[in-house]
């Protein structure tokens, strides 16, 4: 659910992915999950074509997408290899989304939360200073929705994420907005680990009210 919610928040879920994108996402998830280890070789085009039931050209396009995101490298004569994590485009929307489809490593979650704690207080301040009346109304509407959805874990997660998105967008800072994926990923990862009981939802609402 978290991966698809991430795409929803990024307004990308309405675009149906083509075959090459579907292949890149499936391979990307497996790489992020560690099924393919760093420096390990990935099966050749023929084997991947048979496994996924698509043409070799589709496999090539899917691999190219992963090369562009830093997850794979292709060398003539030695095959396709998984690159070291330090080379991955970790701020890429797909890479962030794929982390939400697997068990998040504690160190990566901590790094996401560190970034969130650094960015969100500033975002709230800028939203107060630079946000329009309509944007402030969006924040208030999202907070009200949180109260209305507090009985449901999944619906509350959506409402909470929309609240934070409204604040980020009200800050009217293009650089900050380009990094909203980090906030979404940190938020969804932490909620998945800590918000397992609907009764816990109500306890977080007063903290969100303070932003208003």
Predicted regions and their residues:
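Short linear motifs at protein or domain termini
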Residues: 1-119, 125
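Short helix-capping and inter-helix turn/linker motifs at the boundaries of alpha-helical repeat units
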Residues: 18, 201-202
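Conserved amphipathic alpha-helical segments that form helical-bundle/coiled-coil interaction surfaces
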Residues: 112-193, 202-210
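Membrane-interface catalytic loops of GT-C/OST-like multi-pass glycosylation enzymes that act
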Residues: 197
